[in-house]
Swiss-Prot record:
Alphabetized PANTHER family for the sequence: DNA REPAIR PROTEIN RADA (PTHR32472), DNA REPAIR PROTEIN RADA-LIKE PROTEIN (PTHR32472:SF10)
Binding residues annotated for ATP, in chain numbering: 93-100
InterPro entries, per database record: AAA+_ATPase, DNA_repair_RadA, P-loop_NTPase, RecA_ATP-bd, Ribosomal_Su5_D2-typ_SF, Ribsml_uS5_D2-typ_fold_subgr, Rubredoxin_2
Presence of the UniProt keyword Lyase in the record: no
Cellular component aspect of the GO annotation: cytosol
Similarity remark: Belongs to the RecA family. RadA subfamily.
EC number: 3.6.4.-
Zinc fingers classed as C4-type: ranges: 11-28
This protein's name: DNA repair protein RadA
Residues annotated as transmembrane: none
Upper classification of the organism: Bacteria, Pseudomonadati, Chlamydiota, Chlamydiia, Chlamydiales
Length: 453
């Protein structure tokens, strides 16, 4: 009698499983995200005995050449000082944002250092990929294109070519023929990534994987996909703008939350040497409702413009909208502004926007957001050319922020003359900054509002 094929229902967002179909995923609570997949049968007679033995940590010798430098300052920095041999890097982003372009340029830089690159172009033909390479002036003989989606054929090509670098474009199109599910399904993405990880670690092949993202901006596929790889990078930005951002959210071999800003040109992507200047280049002069705040992105500071608009509301329920700023935190801050500084906003529509399409979550932008709102409401400017730094507590107090010196140095570099900051942190700054940079300390949000009046 033939054995019955077992199936299970797996969430295509988080990878959670259930024995039967459910309308809502029990893991991530998304609706209609469970799909049916076959459960692979365990092989009979397999042994659980390990083929390796434990190794003393002190006896392991590290190679000095364990990292490969891409010869691109920004790329090497965001990867923690070059890419580690045998590592698996996942690059996720929206369609058409430039993921393939970026990795083709990366392949060219690595090939120029005599590394052999295998580029698996599963989504495009060889002709389409070569046309893009020609536009980017890429013609290295050490870059090999392989238009294939079958994992078995890819593994055979890897064994034949023995590349140093492997690029998969993209993971959602590659399939394992031993599984009875469609390419891009939870089971396929999980198993294909696992096998690529095994190949990368055993053969010391540095691997880059391109992944699609969902509507919410997360990499499509099971959450285990991000756990399997060594580095997760998000490629962000507006496809209608000429700049892109790469943000590291996971890195086993370096720091996380690093940010790399690139500009799109006819011949590919190039690093922006002065990111603060990029986001402030269209600011013509002092404007009510506008504040400049320094935020920390990875190991560097970045100046951005925060704009607020306050107008009378014709409706009983005023509108509160944000772009690039957490709306829940903004509602909380407006409540603090009304309660602690007696700024009446209950009949006003309030809008807040981060210019350039950036998204910020750090609390050091609190004070800048509230001063921008007050500036728009009272139609008053800050008296000096200053940046604004500070977290606002529920009691209206201005709280300390991290990396204050780094933020102020970035403001000084960009030509600003002073800063509004927590009063209690002024004494911790170096003497040079205290003497050569105008510092205005504030204890409460009410003190900060007085600077406008």
């Amino acid at each position: 009698m033939a054995t019955k094929t077992k199936t299970q229902w797996t969430c295509n967002q988080c990878g959670a499983t259930a024995p039967k179909w459910l309308g809502q995923c029990p893991g991530c609570h998304n609706w209609n995200s469970l799909v049916e997949e076959y459960v692979p049968q365990a092989r009979s007679g397999t042994s659980s005995r390990s083929s390796t033995s434990a190794i003393a940590l002190s006896s392991i010798e590290l190679e000095n050449e364990s990292r490969i430098f891409i010869d691109h300052a920004g790329w090497d920095r965001i990867l923690g000082g070059g890419v580690v041999r045998g590592s698996l890097t996942l690059l996720g982003g929206d369609p058409g944002i430039g993921k393939s372009t970026l990795l083709l340029q990366t392949a060219e830089r690595l090939a120029s250092q005599k590394y052999k690159v295998l580029y698996v172009c599963g989504e495009e033909s060889v002709t389409q990929t070569s046309l893009r390479a020609k536009r980017l002036n890429i013609s290295s003989p050490l870059i090999y294109l392989f238009p294939e989606t079958n994992l078995d054929n890819i593994k055979q090509q890897i064994a034949t070519l023995e590349p140093d670098i492997l690029i998969i474009d993209s993971i959602q199109i590659i399939f394992n023929p031993t599984l009875n599910s469609a390419p891009g399904s939870v089971a396929q993405v999980r198993e294909v990534t696992y096998e690529l990880m095994q190949i990368a670690k055993s053969a010391q092949i540095t691997t880059f994987i391109i992944g699609h993202v969902t509507k919410s901006g997360e990499i499509a596929g099971p959450r285990v996909l991000e756990h399997l790889v060594d580095t997760v990078l998000y490629f962000e930005g507006n496809s209608h703008a000429n700049y892109r951002m790469i943000r590291s959210v996971k890195n086993r071999f370096g720091p996380t939350n690093e940010l790399l800003i690139l500009s799109m040109h006819a011949d590919g992507l190039k690093e922006v040497s002065n990111p603060s200047g990029l986001f402030l280049q269209e600011k013509t002069g002092p404007t009510t409702g506008s504040m400049i705040i320094p935020i920390i992105e990875g190991s560097g500071a970045l100046l951005i413009e925060l704009q607020a608009l306050v107008s009378s509301s014709p409706f009983a329920n005023p509108v509160r909208k944000t772009a690039g700023f957490d709306p829940n935190r903004f509602s909380l801050l407006l409540a603090v502004l009304e309660k602690r500084a007696q700024v009446k906003l209950f009949t006003m529509d309030v809008f807040l926007s981060i210019t350039g399409g950036l998204k910020i979550i750090e609390p050091a932008a609190d004070l800048g957001a509230l001063l921008a709102v007050a500036s728009s409401l009272y139609n008053r400017l800050l008296p000096n050319n200053s940046i604004v730094i500070g977290e606002v507590g529920l009691g209206g107090e201005i709280r300390h922020v991290a990396h204050l010196e780094r933020r102020i140095k970035e403001g000084k570099l960009m030509g600003f003359e002073g800063a509004i900051l927590p009063e209690g942190q002024i004494s911790s700054l170096p003497k040079e900054i205290r003497e050569n940079f105008r510092l205005q300390g504030v204890k409460t949000i009410k003190d900060a509002i007085r600077l406008l009046l």
